[in-house]
Structures are given as C-alpha cells and as structure tokens.
Amino acid sequence: MRGRDLCSSTQSQALGSLRTTTPAFTLNIPSEANHTEQPPAGLGARLQEAGVSIPPRRGRPTPTLEKKKKPHLMAEDEPSGALLKPLVFRVDETTPAVVQSVLLERGWNKFDKQEQNAEDWNLYWRTSSFRMTEHNSVKPWQQLNHHPGTTKLTRKDCLAKHLKHMRRMYGTSLYQFIPLTFVMPNDYTKFVAEYFQERQMLGTKHSYWICKPAELSRGRGILIFSDFKDFIFDDMYIVQKYISNPLLIGRYKCDLRIYVCVTGFKPLTIYVYQEGLVRFATEKFDLSNLQNNYAHLTNSSINKSGASYEKIKEVIGHGCKWTLSRFFSYLRSWDVDDLLLWKKIHRMVILTILAIAPSVPFAANCFELFGFDILIDDNLKPWLLEVNYSPALTLDCSTDVLVKRKLVHDIIDLIYLNGLRNEGREASNATHGNSNIDAAKSDRGGLDAPDCLPYDSLSFTSRMYNEDDSVVEKAVSVRPEAAPASQLEGEMSGQDFHLSTREMPQSKPKLRSRHTPHKTLMPYASLFQSHSCKTKTSPCVLSDRGKAPDPQAGNFVLVFPFNEATLGASRNGLNVKRIIQELQKLMNKQHS
C-alpha cells in the first residue's frame, strides 16, 4: 500500500467550496402612479386552494428586485412587482455571531422589540434551551432552534444510562460503539470491582480510564489515570474505559465532530452533515504521560492555547483542525474504505438518538443541532465519546470558517425546506397577517428533489466529497459567503496545507474492494416502487404529514428514515423494535 500527496487536491477541494458568485440585482420602479400589487402567481393559487383570499394591495410604487443571477435554487420565478418582505430572526446574548452574520447576509432582518410586535419574527436562535411554555406559544410561522427534552442525550451521565438501557433491551451487538462506562457515585462499587478484576487479568500490563464531569464541556475537569490511587472525583462524574489505541495521524490523536440535525422527533427525522471538523491534539500521543492534556485531549479550547498550536506539525500542519473531507481524503489515499466508516457513523447516530426519541415530548416548529464527538481507533472502529448541545460555532481559524458558515447556511435551507411543510402553514401565515411568506420562499428557495425517500442511506452511502467538486455544485447551488474567497484562499494556501500527508496511518486499515467503484454525490436510487417520485418539489406546497422528508439540503443528508419500513415505523408513534430489526438486517447484509 502506498500513499499519495493529497495537499494540492485537498486544498483545491476546500477552496472550491468558497468560489461563489455574488448575485447582481437591478431596481425596477413601476411607472404607474396607482400601482396594484398581486401575490405571486404560484403562491396565490395555493392560497386559493387553501380557501384563503388575499385582496390586491394599492399604494405607492414599491421598488422590486429583479434577479440577474440566482443565489439559490428557486421554487419558481417571482413576477416583477412582487413584494418581498425580509424574514426576521430573533437573538439573545448567547446567539453565535456566525448565525447572525449568515442570516443578515441572506437578507433577513434582526428582530427589534422596540419597533416590532412581539410575534413578528420567524426564527429564534440561542444557545440555551427554551421553556415548554415558549414551545407551546410558538406561532405557525416561527421556528425555535431547540427541541424540548434533548439534554437527556447531551448530559454524559444521562447518555450513558440511556445507551445502557438500549443495550439491555435490544442486545449488545448494535450498541458496541460506546466505551464501558460507569456513572459516579452510583456505580462506584461496580467500577472498583471491574478495575481490580481487569488488573488481575492483565497482570503487569496497564489499563487506562478517563473520568469526566457529567455536565461540563470543552475538556474541563477531565482526568486520565491508570493507577486507582490517582482516581479522585466529586459530584456527578462518569468513568469510561480510555481508548488507548486511537488512530494516529502523524503520531497525533484526533477525533471527529459530526454535525447532526433532527428536524423532528414526531415523526423522527435525522440528517447528518457530510462535512465537519477533525480536531487534533497538538502534542504527540504518549501513554507514559497521562497528565499531558495536549497529547490526550483534542478539544480545540484546550489545544489552541498550547505551545505547539502555531507550529508546523508532522502531517497535520498548522493549528489543530482539519475539515472532515480532508480527513477522508487522507484515508482514501491509503485505500481505506471510507464508505464503510460512514455507514458505521450513520448507524451510530440513529441508534443514539433512538435511545431518547420515544420519551421526547412533542413540540412543533423546532429543530436540534447536535455535535457528535467520535473517536476512530486503529482498527477503524468508531467510538461515541459524547453528544454536544449547541455545538460551538465560534470561528477560531480558517477551517472553522470553511465548515461553520456553510453549516449555518445549510441549516437554514434544511429547516425551510422541511420545517414549513406542515399542512396549512401558508394559509395560517396569511390568516395571521404574516407578510413574510414571499421572502421565506425566496430565501430558502426550492430543491429539485424527489418526493420519496432517496436511498438506503446506511447500506448504500455515497461519497460526499471526491476529487471533482463540480458534482457538489451540480447537486446544490452554492450560496454567497460573507468572507471574501480571496482572503480565505490566502489563509488556506499557507501553513494549514504546508505538509504532505504521505504517511501511513497508525492503523490496520480495511482495504476497499477492487470491485467496488467510487461513488459520486447523491446516487438517489429510491427504494420505493410504490411511491411515484415527482420531478420537482416546491417547499411551499401544502402536503400531508405522511410525506417523506427531503433527501438532502446542502451537505445535510437524510439518514433516518432510511427505507419504507422505517418510514412507516416512525409515523404513528415510534416503533423502536421494528427500526432496530431493520438496522440489524443492514448489519447482517454488510457482514455477509
């Protein structure tokens, strides 16, 4: 097996995603003194079908925007003279700056409680959760960026308890992706028994454990130990078996930050973002020094303050982050089966969310973005470390800019393709006097996508990134980015890509079958012969609640439901047992 230099190709991939076209607009002023405005033809027809009549509005001539070049895929062309009122977003002091920047860039207005009615907003995005009363009072045209009840997944002790319950209910074969875990202080006796039993079996060989505070994040309060006398804890902690054989790149430990968006729990709908972050420790992995956090912890909040952060490190280069696409390019350069790894990650995400999904209360018009932290060991097995609530969207480096700005863009596209499809939404907006409907349509655009489920995303996962980025551009239009591409090109062409990635990974990689062709983006071969797929779908069309979710929005790919059986098992209540059976079938197929 031999490697190849991925620096230039990887750099061109990263920069390719930044080459955008800024839309040009011209201003048309109607010449008639008494100008009459009619709703857009497509929208008016749908509102008439819903039994809502909108009288023509008369008034002063209104400047209108005529598009020369579309920044997004459009559901339909807007007629000249259509009134476009911007959507409104609401924030608090915790709202990430990149979210506000992206929304303003897309033409949204920021909510001003001094000048606007209390309900005159479309999206409320903040870091903290919402009270149930806030969920209950949300209007049909509004969206919240959190779902109630999801902290059961993001507290480390709760996650461990729920996954332990799922393992007990459905067997260990599916739930082998979490390290052996004990919740302190309740499991203290069990941990002590396990520790000394293992110590007796291993003899002089060391075993390693990691102790984490249940509620803290960003690597705070973490202790790694081998000797029991070093084990100290107070309050709520978890103790896990430390993965002592991580996949090393340039002898540095890394983990993956995978972004997952759940657009609804009833019915359950899960999307996985096919780009993400790879976070590196900034000092070389060394089990003989467990106190060196820069060698054992990959949290960027820790490593960006380390002495080696600015250095050009072997293979990794400058800083402590790669894009996920660069990481998979590195694996492919050594003939590692990255598609199989993606399947395992998708399955892990589904099984993890299934652990809490039945107990999550119903709430309309909300979504949840999770950050899954996953470690790959030297056998290419993915391990779930934790799930993060409100994953950090700060822009600390050029890699953050590349990933997180487009992530926010794609979340907005995803939510306004799926979140506003509920039956009667447009009619309700018009009835309540919300005049933001047209702007919602122009911002989120439309996506030429089938009305049915795309493919079995776990048994046939496509490569999201390959050497030809044009595939991505054909599938989804690239939206304008605020940061100038030339500025980022200068950053990305420097130290971040200074070194060749020609080093054998510290692993035993599974080779790709010679008979397995490399797949390109979105081979959406539907599994449903009983569903007639339409050639074009407008996000504004009133639809029934049994409609299959959109297969993709930007880099978000639907992973659940993944076939007709799981679609049915998630509609009228959540049939977890049936879903588990379908997942087990896929595992059996992959192993056969």
Curated annotation (Swiss-Prot):
Binding site for ATP: 212, 218-219, 240-243, 253-255, 298-299
Sequence positions that bind L-glutamate: 279, 301, 321, 404
UniProt-annotated binding residues for Mg(2+) 2: 386, 388
Required co-factors: Mg(2+)
Residues annotated to bind a protein: 218
Membrane listed as a keyword: no
Keyword Nucleotide-binding applies: yes
Region Disordered, residue ranges: 1-23, 51-77
Gene Ontology MF: a single term: tubulin-glutamic acid ligase activity
Tissue: Testis.
An annotated GO BP: microtubule cytoskeleton organization
Site features described as Essential for specifying initiation versus elongation step of the polyglutamylase activity, chain residue numbers: 218
Alphabetical UniProt keywords: ATP-binding, Ligase, Magnesium, Metal-binding, Nucleotide-binding
EC number: 6.-.-.-
Functional description taken from the UniProt entry: Probable tubulin polyglutamylase that generates side chains of glutamate on the gamma-carboxyl group of specific glutamate residues within the C-terminal tail of target proteins. Similar to TTLL1, may acquire enzymatic activity only in complex with other proteins as it is most likely lacking domains important for autonomous activity. Probably involved in the side-chain initiation step of the polyglutamylation reaction rather than the elongation step.
Record-given protein name: Probable tubulin polyglutamylase TTLL2
Organismal lineage: Eukaryota, Metazoa, Chordata, Craniata, Vertebrata
